[in-house]
């Protein structure tokens, strides 16, 4: 009898063990939940060609706040679910998913059975104790085919086009604008819904995505068949890109900086006198009187008297005007003092004696907008240039120093800086866009900023590539940086034609702007800028107006005219960006996905 009882207990224990290993399956809308001994997995179709995957440990939760994804309701889809001892098979009209019950890993196929992508191993959760919270390092590995190319991830100025065999750290800096969206020549994309430091790595064995802070692992697999369709799926989840006013696609004249009203108006008048095509003039920083009044949100009356009349004169000459503002605020400004009274400022003092406001706090964003509206929009400003939205608090120069300084701030309105490291620009642009649209529907929103994150295309913001130096190598790297940025689903990108700095930040022209060698580089960068989504000259140390480049100026004028001759075509493409989720600046693999010779070409595009 004793041996029979022992045998029965062994059988029962084995059955329980096998049940724990194979997992329990629960049907949910458009998908299933799988529960195993040490991992929970949720698979849901958000469209026939988009699947969301959430994985979490038993002690954690599937719940989370998504800042990037705004599609929060599931459509009615005809999803079939079949279960056997080992697998759960989910089928939509476009995709089949195999969920392995033993360990919760997934494999994706077309409806005809062709492999799309496979998870290489089960998800990895490593408990970690951080300042202010306990969480997990999270990681998912994938198995790719050897012959596919990978693109996206935002803007990285390392000169690489195809990210096969590469490692990329996703941390915002002055010249790195990151977004965790990856796209393949095989017609799939992954949107990785995490805001902390993230590392993409591709080796011969596996491709992996690792993030520093997460309660769960959350990603979307988008299968479009073509790269255009994948990007459309990304925008289905995160928002459409609005159409700018036609003027925004014309030429933008800027420099660091126009020092007073007379200089600004004289540049506008000189362009019209010379009959050089142009739509836009930009007032950079220091329209305030000192660092203590940094980003005060109104013109210094001594340098720019009667700003409303000044802008009326600009508008009367068929110009639009954009102005630079910062999330860092000087201590003598009224906006700083009201932010401080409400507890909306971070304690860290920035490099120009300012403090940054907490853009994760909706009330702080509303207060920020109040000062913009009353001091700048009210006098006729057409567009906002929001600088330093990484945020680059202390003028850090590397990803490591930027990460360290941002984390040192500690907490924001939503949680720890480690958890929301990369999302400052997204939440700030989101709220600025919403406030502008709520206040007036008479003018389309245009903004320029130096950072990006997934979803930011919905905010009417263009990103520029940061404070680059002037050199041929840096110029070359702009091309692959801009292409991968646009292939990450964010359609509007630009750069400082001529480089922000001539003889520093990697710039090599120590003899200044009158050096013919620099003028030649400027001309080539100007020609490239002609064929970028947004056409903008900007920089320091030397004037950037078209007539300031000696024998090279006629070449600049020629390409400026070419931009305007192309305007009907450019504006038609811009409508396709909004209406059809098109990409204007196209890496060659988008149009030649079956030609491996195009995969690493980072100096050509469509």
Task: Identify the function of each model-found stretch.
Residues 92-118:
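Hydrophobic or amphipathic alpha-helical targeting/insertion segments
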Residues 29, 38, 76, 85, ...:
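Short beta-strand-initiation
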Residues 1-25, 29:
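Bacterial Sec-dependent N-terminal signal peptides
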Residues 30-36, 53, 86-93, 106-109, ...:
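Generic recognition of long tandem-repeat/solenoid scaffolds
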Residues 114-606:
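Catalytic-domain carbohydrate-binding cleft regions of carbohydrate-active enzymes
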Residues 41-45, 95-101, 188-190:
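Broad, structure-driven detector of short, well-ordered beta-strand segments within folded domains
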Residues 22-27, 34, 43-44, 77-83, ...:
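Short, exposed beta-strand/loop patches in secreted or surface proteins that constitute
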Residues 29, 44-88, 126-127:
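A low-complexity, Ser/Thr/Gly/Pro-enriched, surface-exposed linker/loop concept
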């Amino acid at each position: 009898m004793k041996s029979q009882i022992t045998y029965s207990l062994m059988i029962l224990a084995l059955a329980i063990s096998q049940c724990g290993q194979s997992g329990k399956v629960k049907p949910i809308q458009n998908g299933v939940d799988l529960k195993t001994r040490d991992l929970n997995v949720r698979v849901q179709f958000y469209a026939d060609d988009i699947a969301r995957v959430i994985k979490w440990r038993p002690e954690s939760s599937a719940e989370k706040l998504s800042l990037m994804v705004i599609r929060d309701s599931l459509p009615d889809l005809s999803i079939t679910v079949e279960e056997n001892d080992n697998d759960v098979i989910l089928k939509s009209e476009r995709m089949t998913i195999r969920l392995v019950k033993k360990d919760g890993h997934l494999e994706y196929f077309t409806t005809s059975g062709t492999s799309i992508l496979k998870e290489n191993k089960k998800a990895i959760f490593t408990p970690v104790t951080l300042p202010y919270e306990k969480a997990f390092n999270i990681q998912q590995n994938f198995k790719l085919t050897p012959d596919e190319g990978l693109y996206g991830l935002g803007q990285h100025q390392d000169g690489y086009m195809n990210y096969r065999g590469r490692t990329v750290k996703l941390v915002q800096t002055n010249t790195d604008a990151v977004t965790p969206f990856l796209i393949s020549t095989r017609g799939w994309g992954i949107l990785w819904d995490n805001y902390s430091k993230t590392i993409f790595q591709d080796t011969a064995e596996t491709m992996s995505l690792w993030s520093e802070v997460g309660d769960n692992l959350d990603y979307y697999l988008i299968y479009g068949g073509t790269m255009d369709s994948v990007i459309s799926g990304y925008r289905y989840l995160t928002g459409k890109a609005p159409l700018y006013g036609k003027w925004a696609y014309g030429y933008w004249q800027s420099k660091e900086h126009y020092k007073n009203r007379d200089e600004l108006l004289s540049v506008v008048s000189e362009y019209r006198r010379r009959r050089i095509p142009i739509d836009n003039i930009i007032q950079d920083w220091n329209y305030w009187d000192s660092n203590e009044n940094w980003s005060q949100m109104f013109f210094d009356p001594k340098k720019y008297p009667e700003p409303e009349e000044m802008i009326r004169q600009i508008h009367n000459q068929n110009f639009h005007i954009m102005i630079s503002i910062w999330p860092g605020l000087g201590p003598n400004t009224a906006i700083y003092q009201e932010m401080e009274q409400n507890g909306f400022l971070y304690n860290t003092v920035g490099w120009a004696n300012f403090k940054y406001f907490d853009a994760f706090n909706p009330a702080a964003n509303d207060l920020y907008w109040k000062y913009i509206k009353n001091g700048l929009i009210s006098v006729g400003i057409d567009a906002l240039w929001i600088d330093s939205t990484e945020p680059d608090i202390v003028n850090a120069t590397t990803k490591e120093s930027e990460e360290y300084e941002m984390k040192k701030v500690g907490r924001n309105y939503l949680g720890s800086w480690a958890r929301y490291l990369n999302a400052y620009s997204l939440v700030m642009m989101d709220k600025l866009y919403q406030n502008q649209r709520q206040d007036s529907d008479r003018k389309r929103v245009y903004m320029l900023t130096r950072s990006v994150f997934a979803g930011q295309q919905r905010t009417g913001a263009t990103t520029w590539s940061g404070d680059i130096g002037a050199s041929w190598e840096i110029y070359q790297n702009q091309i692959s940086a801009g292409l991968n940025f646009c292939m990450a689903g964010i359609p509007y990108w630009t750069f400082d034609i001529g480089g922000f700095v001539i003889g520093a930040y990697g710039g090599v022209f120590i003899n200044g702007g009158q050096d013919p060698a620099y003028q030649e580089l400027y001309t080539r960068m100007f020609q490239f800028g002609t064929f970028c989504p947004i056409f903008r000259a900007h920089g320091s140390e030397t004037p950037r107006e078209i007539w300031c480049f000696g024998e090279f100026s006629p070449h600049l004028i020629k390409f400026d005219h070419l931009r305007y001759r192309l305007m009907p075509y450019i504006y038609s493409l811009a409508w396709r960006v909004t209406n059809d989720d098109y990409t204007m600046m196209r890496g060659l693999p988008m149009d030649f996905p079956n030609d491996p010779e195009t995969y690493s070409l980072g100096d050509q595009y469509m």
